[in-house]
Amino acid sequence: QNEKLKEANTQAAVRAGHSSTSGRNYGDSGKIILVFSPKGGSGSTTLTTNLGVALHSEETPVVVVDGKLQFGDLSFFYNQQGPNNVTDLAPRGNELDHQVVEEVLVVHESSGVSILSAPPQLERSEEVSGVEFSQILKYLRRMFSYIIIDTGSNLDEVTLAGIDIADLIVLITTQDIPAIKNVRLFMNLTDLLGVDRNQILFLLNKFDKRRSINADRIGDITKQTVMGTIPVDEKFVIPAMDRGIPFIIENPSNSVSKAVFKFAEVLKERIAENDQVEEFELEN
């Protein structure tokens, strides 16, 4: 077991980039990925945590942003808490610079992923408006290749701001009927908002092949193709979560970890495809 953990940490260290993003400037090319599930308990924070590790490298630095401003616990999933949080950036949205942002971010030591935490006090969640949240995300585009936002199941001002600015929405469901029903409601809303369906990457989480409803059936019901499945393995996922260790680091060869790595590749391919379409439309 110790050898497996050592191997996993070694692989994570290879994937990890520099702790600091000073001097980096990506223009406005960083991609904003919003992780959303319209039903609580579907695993959005767990996915955000591990997807961040899967996408991060020295060439493609990642920041994860806790958009659950009232009850966010993203930093605990990395076991990496700092003294500052998103409310320290919100009032300075028009005057952000790399140094100011880096003072607020916390870097996960074993992966290199940067973390922008939610406020620890419930009452402080009201200090961040949707406009201010958008300003922060736009600035993070200059510093990181991927900005991954973990959001709650409520469509509050901050989540709607994230949907509006996101390059890609990772929409999570499970095999539960209420979750699938809520996905249909969310898809109806995004259609009304004019969100291109190619900007939505549909993921089936906690997949149990013993259950009668499968990915194809869910795709038929929601009229959105399921682009990835993460198998259920609570005996593997929950202990790692309780220790504050991304499971993708603890054991990258587990089937759940492999599924996250595979989904990360699907995500990168979709972003590249959407970029090509956008370039073609601009040229014509």
Report residues per predicted region:
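Acidic-aromatic/histidine active-site loop/patch
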Residues: 1-32, 192, 200, 269-284
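Phosphate-binding loop that captures ATP/GTP phosphates
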Residues: 55-115
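Hydrophobic/aromatic-enriched cytosolic interaction surfaces used to assemble or bind macromolecules
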Residues: 87-90, 225, 258, 263-284
